[in-house]
Amino acid sequence: AKPLVSASNPPATPGLDKYSAPHWLGARANRRFHVMAKPAGSACNLDCAYCFYLSKRVLPGGPGSGHMPDDVLERFVKDYIDSVTSDEVVFSWQGGEPTLLGLEFFEKVVTLQKKHARAGQRIENDLQTNGTLLDDDWARFLKQQRFLVGLSIDGPREIHDHCRITKHAEPTFDQVFAAAKMLQKHGVRFNTLTCVHRYNASRPLDVYRFLRREIGSTYIQFIPIVEIRGFENMAPGTWDEAKLPMLGDPRCHPDHPESVVTPWSVAAEEYGYFLSKIWDEWQARDVGKVLVNLCETLVAQHMGLPSQVCVHSEICGKGVALEHDGDVYSCDHYVYPEYRLGNIRQQSLGDMVFSPRQVKFGYAKSETLPAYCRRCEFLSDCWGECPKNRLLRTPDGEPGLNYLCAGLK
């Protein structure tokens, strides 16, 4: 029988290993990748309790915060357009809080995109924001330039304001709710991004129905908050595996005084409860009306289509992070010196994304799965979720089990 050809087992090329095989990941004809740009670095006007990015400003050897210089911005816009071979290029602007740079920065972005776009090429922009700085001028610009806005909101007032507060510990719900209504008034396309954490995971339907009915969101994204204790200075995969708790150990729970994760991390079982309740509601009432990222991708995978989210894909690595100073990292959850790929002032984005080092990073998602995962009936649905969340050992003692495993099952 012929060996199975899959994403983690590509066809052989004489003289090349799979990490450098140009026809698989790096072929010029197939150079499609995504860059998450952080033009203000970790700078933000909020102080959300669970934010993993604020600490980058003091990370030794890290990117800090700042304002992307004009030369770096133009280099990025031109290089990204030149490096991607598809007819569509999507620029994603995140943070920190990118609107801190002001409307003028993004007017400059659009001007540069028009300057460097190839004939017939479609340029799209999306902007992830906490919404607190948006006003009518912003909304008119976003509408005119066809930006897709991602609005961060965690649910009803009492849930949202538990974690998403200002530097002076003031609530932000009213500002974010007003931003949603203003975007609707101006006809700006937007979706919602909701973090699932220790303080809202027990109220899935309150969160979902609020987003659906009060905010009017028709594209809802949920992301779990999972952070290992000491994440501020410890890059994923650099921890002592011998000290990781085994599945079922009390230290797997965020309430335990010696928990492997921070107190605000979602508990695995609660995350499973949260998703199950939302799946039931979505399936019964909202299929075809509301897009829920984790529900949609599960349906797609069961139809034989690839996952729509990186964490449930067999391989990753085609989504890198660009910092304000031009440094490029393997992923926005891997913005640590150990995962710095280079700087766009010296290297092209394409060369960094399709370098053997980054390709190995992408393949490691499936290649490093423990045997417990490889024989799991849900492997093709999960693929070990995000590698940065592999904080447990299996019942056999093998490291590499995802913290959310029990909940995802």
Predicted segment positions?
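Local cysteine-cluster metal-coordination motifs and their immediate loop/turn environment
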Residues: 43-54, 330-333, 369-389
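C-terminal accessory region of radical SAM enzymes
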Residues: 247-258, 263-302, 333-377
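Canonical Radical SAM [4Fe-4S] cluster-binding loop centered on the CxxxCxxC motif
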Residues: 30-71
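Short Fe-S-cluster ligation motifs
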Residues: 75-94, 361-364, 399-409
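Radical SAM/AdoMet-radical enzyme domain recognition
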Residues: 73, 77-92, 101-250
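N-terminal [4Fe-4S]-dependent radical SAM core
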Residues: 1-37
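Short, small/polar residue-rich loop motifs at catalytic or cofactor-binding pockets
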Residues: 313-316
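Short, acidic, Ser/Thr-enriched surface-loop or helix-capping motifs
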Residues: 323
